Amino acid sequence: MKILSVLLLALIICSIVGWSEAQFTNVSCTTSKECWSVCQRLHNTSRGKCMNKKCRCYS
């Protein structure tokens, strides 16, 4: 039971820290496809996602 609580705590800490290294932009979008060129231009990566009508780039 102790191990389970330690694992749960570790999972929560990892979720809070946000190790995804996402970079937010102020560019409006409706689909993730629109973010690919924006992320390439701004952050030199083609991995982007449209979240809450804003582009979010991942490194």
Curated annotation (Swiss-Prot):
InterPro entries: Scorpion_toxin-like_sf (IPR036574), Scorpion_toxinS_K_inh (IPR001947)
Keywords: Antibiotic, Antimicrobial, Calcium-activated potassium channel impairing toxin, Disulfide bond, Fungicide, Ion channel impairing toxin, Neurotoxin, Potassium channel impairing toxin, Pyrrolidone carboxylic acid, Secreted, Signal, Toxin, Voltage-gated potassium channel impairing toxin
SUPFAM superfamilies found in the cross-reference section: Scorpion toxin-like
GO cellular component: extracellular region
The keyword Disulfide bond belongs to this UniProt entry's keyword annotation: yes
Site residues (Basic residue of the functional dyad), renumbered to this chain: 49
Gene3D superfamilies the record matches: Knottin, scorpion toxin-like (3.30.30.10)
S-S pairs: 29-50, 35-55, 39-57
Molecular-function GO term, any one: toxin activity
Residues spanning the signal sequence: 1-22
Modified residues (Pyrrolidone carboxylic acid): 23
Note: Negative results: does not or very weakly inhibits Kv1.1/KCNA1, Kv2.1/KCNB1 (Ki>2 uM), Kv3.1/KCNC1 (Kd>1 uM), Kv11.1/KCNH2, KCa2.1/KCNN1 (IC(50)> 1 uM), KCa2.2/ KCNN2 (IC(50)> 1 uM), KCa2.3/ KCNN3 (IC(50)> 1 uM). Does not inhibit the growth of Gram-positive and Gram-negative bacteria.
Job description of the protein: This toxin inhibits numerous potassium channels: shaker (Ki=227 nM), Kv1.2/KCNA2 (nanomolar range), Kv1.3/KCNA3 (nanomolar range), Kv1.5/KCNA5 (Kd>100 nM), Kv1.6/KCNA6 (Ki=22 nM), KCa1.1/KCNMA1 (IC(50)=5.9 nM). It blocks channel activity by a simple bimolecular inhibition process. It also shows a weak interaction with nicotinic acetylcholine receptors (nAChR), suggesting it may weakly inhibit it. It also exhibits pH-specific antimicrobial activities against bacteria (B.subtilis, E.coli and S.aureus) and the fungus C.albicans.
Similarity annotation: Belongs to the short scorpion toxin superfamily. Potassium channel inhibitor family. Alpha-KTx 01 subfamily.
Protein name: Potassium channel toxin alpha-KTx 1.1
Organism: Leiurus hebraeus (Hebrew deathstalker scorpion)
